[in-house]
Amino acid sequence: MTEAMNITLSTQPADARWGDKATYSINNDGITLHLNGNDDLGLIQRAARKIDGLGIKQVALTGEGWDIERCWAFWAGYKGPKGVRTVMWPDLDDAQRQELDNRLTIIDWVRDTINAPAEELGPEQLAQRAVDLLCSVACDHVTYRITKGEDLREQNYMGLHTVGRGSERSPVLLALDYNPTGDKDAPVYACLVGKGITFDSGGYSIKQSAFMDSMKSDMGGAATVTGALAFAITRGLNKRVKLFLCCADNLISGNAFKLGDIIRYRNGKNVEVMNTDAEGRLVLADGLIDASAQHPQLIIDMATLTGAAKTALGNDYHALFSFDDTLAGRLLSSAAQENEPFWRLPLAEFHRNQLPSNFAELNNTGSAAYPAGASTAAGFLSHFVENYREGWLHIDCSATYRKAPVEQWAAGATGLGVRTIANLLTA
């Protein structure tokens, strides 16, 4: 068996022979990471990515200075989508070790689920994986309902049914109830709604290959809110929370939805489809209607919704939208506590009116006259939230997935957002 490479921390600069910008050095005892007090967690994560790039697959984090956040930063950079990596962790107190184990279980589940090929992860498989994860942490307090295929149409989940009907794999709505109170009439504190498009071809508004090749990850919002609920439970969540995952493929077939179709929703809204590649908002609408019907204090939806958010923020931040300044501030405070990147983008009342249609109340995409695509998408969703000005957060999760490796991340899913939402739920 190969001996593990020792990784130690130092606050002293590297030997001058390594250069004045060296973040790590190598000697007979292993590899030393040289912390300088300027973004030490980022330095550790970037160094871990380089260590993985050297082909070193077994490491031991040894010596002084390894707390849970530094351990986690190392793992975030070290983990990749190919191969097996082994880490011997330093001694941590019981609470920190339990927290680390929970992160390794749940956030790695999120990353691995998002990275899974679409052929292996259809709508029903995604819903079942979510159930399995939540049952693994709180099965006694979890009940759920899976509605799929024609049952969705019969129960008037028209957005989800319309988008998903073009695939041989039936669309699915997962409605899961985490109720630790033991009281079936307990109020619902929060609802989480996730976009679970397990593959997005764009439909008849078809994507180019360069934009389609990562679309197995278009269920990143659903995976992240599922992980967030599971992680919040491990941190002691004692309030009732409901989870709604809107899962479908968006494919082309003789039964696929078309431009000019009109979708009539249960809340009375009707929407003209002018871009089948703006499908995420169409499925989320059904989940948000259900969430609003619970009258919770808090609704959070999460979706890989727009290219516009990526244009604004790259893959480095999740985009946050809300009419509720106080709640948005709480989310950003949670993000800061968890060292996760969120950035608030504009959402104003006028964005709700920038989706005009000649044939319906709403259009599912903005015209060239209204180019703020991420904000108009959030405005669209607000029409399906009963009290949209209070208690609602929309997260356009640009940072869930990277098509190519960068200094601090391997290609693929990041798991970012799980801890922030869990923090907010348990605050």
From Swiss-Prot:
The EC number(s) this enzyme carries: 3.4.11.23
Main location: cytoplasm
Named cofactor requirement(s): Mn(2+)
Localization annotation: Cytoplasm
Residues annotated as binding Mn(2+) 1: 200, 277, 279
GO molecular function: manganese ion binding; metalloaminopeptidase activity
Top-tier EC class: hydrolase
Catalytic reaction(s) noted: Release of an N-terminal amino acid, Xaa, from a peptide or arylamide. Xaa is preferably Glu or Asp but may be other amino acids, including Leu, Met, His, Cys and Gln
Active site positions, chain numbering: 207, 281
Cofactor: record remark: Binds 2 manganese ions per subunit.
SUPFAM superfamilies in the cross-refs: Zn-dependent exopeptidases
Keywords attached to this entry: Aminopeptidase, Cytoplasm, Hydrolase, Manganese, Metal-binding, Protease
Classification via InterPro entries: Leucine_aapep/pepB, M17_PepB-like_N, Pept_M17_PepB, Peptidase_M17_C
N-terminal signal peptide: none
Binding site for Mn(2+) 2: 195, 200, 218, 279
GO cellular component: cytoplasm
GO biological process: proteolysis
Membership in a protein family: Belongs to the peptidase M17 family.
Subunit and interaction comment: Homohexamer.
HAMAP family: Aminopeptidase_M17
Biological role stated in the UniProt entry: Probably plays an important role in intracellular peptide degradation.
Protein name from the UniProt record: Peptidase B
